[in-house]
């Protein structure tokens, strides 16, 4: 049969509302338009992205199950877990990069105000005086969000209590509710809450400022000598099970590249703080 003759599933290995989910939902309708078949986002959260990634690694290589992979599922987890239920290189064929994304160091706005924290240096000062007083939410152990926070702790010699969630979506709900204090989230998932004033962005984790938040400094810029050289950013891309036909891979790659080039998708992504990067 000519691919696609039925709906195609894009597995997101995290809960709804996070950046992986936002990017998959930006690309899916464009692929549906390009191929005249539905591309459906399927959230399979857990184990820092490993559950969803394993599902795709073991799926038939017929082009009907794709993965929105991340620097976590295909980079970090290999170093973090003793054994993975899949091989991030051998079990997949990369289709295309979708976006590069800075993380943002953010606090619950009320909490920051209450503690008199207006910038990165205030934050470090508070932590030095109150070790482990603040809790640090993440999208799961070993995700880029978790490691961006750990890097910050190790460079500044500070301590926070790590609270892992099953994705940014649930972590953000607790951040907004004031149950979690600080997070180094991927910028797109937090953008709305920052713009709405629920969260305050102290810094971005990339080496340069983000065009989406031009007034927010980088961690390195705001943090003084202890944070010189600090940088943490993430990538997101589409992958298929190993052995998927090169023809299908090429067709998807071209359709994604075309959609990322359209002003509509480009602007949507950039407004969220993602940098579209089809290759």
Predicted feature locations:
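N-terminal (or domain-start) structured segment
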Residues: 1-90, 132-135, 141, 157-186, ...
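Hinge/capping helix and adjacent helix->loop/strand transition within the periplasmic-binding protein
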Residues: 58-63, 79-170, 219-221, 235-268, ...
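Short secondary-structure boundary segments
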Residues: 70-71, 109, 187-188, 206, ...
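A ligand-binding cleft/hinge motif common to bilobed small-molecule-binding domains
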Residues: 74-83, 146, 151-155, 181-218, ...
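HAMP domain helices
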Residues: 230-231
């Amino acid at each position: 049969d000519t691919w696609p003759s039925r709906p195609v599933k894009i597995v997101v290995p995290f809960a709804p509302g996070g950046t992986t989910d936002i990017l998959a939902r930006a690309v899916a309708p464009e692929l549906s338009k390009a191929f005249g078949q539905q591309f459906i986002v399927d959230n399979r959260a857990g184990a820092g992205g490993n559950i969803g990634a394993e599902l795709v690694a073991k799926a038939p290589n017929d082009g009907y199950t794709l993965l929105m992979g991340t620097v976590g599922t295909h980079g970090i987890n290999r170093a973090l877990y003793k054994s993975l239920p899949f091989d991030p290189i051998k079990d997949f064929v990369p289709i295309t990069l979708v976006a590069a994304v800075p993380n943002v160091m953010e606090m619950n706005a009320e909490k920051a105000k209450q503690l008199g924290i207006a910038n990165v240096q205030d934050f470090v000062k508070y932590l030095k005086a109150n070790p482990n007083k603040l809790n640090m939410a993440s999208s799961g152990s070993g995700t880029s969000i978790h490691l961006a926070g750990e890097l910050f702790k190790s460079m500044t010699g500070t301590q926070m209590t790590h609270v892992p969630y099953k994705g940014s979506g649930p972590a953000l709900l607790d951040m907004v509710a004031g149950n979690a204090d600080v997070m180094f989230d991927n910028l797109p998932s937090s953008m709305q809450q920052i713009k709405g004033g629920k969260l305050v962005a102290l810094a971005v984790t990339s080496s340069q400022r983000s065009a989406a938040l031009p007034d927010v400094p980088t961690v390195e810029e705001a943090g003084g000598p202890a944070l010189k050289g600090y940088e943490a950013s993430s990538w997101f891309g589409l992958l298929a099970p190993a052995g998927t036909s090169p023809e299908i891979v090429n067709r998807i790659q071209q359709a994604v590249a075309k959609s990322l080039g359209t002003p509509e998708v480009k602007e949507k992504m950039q407004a969220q703080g993602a940098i579209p990067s089809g290759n």
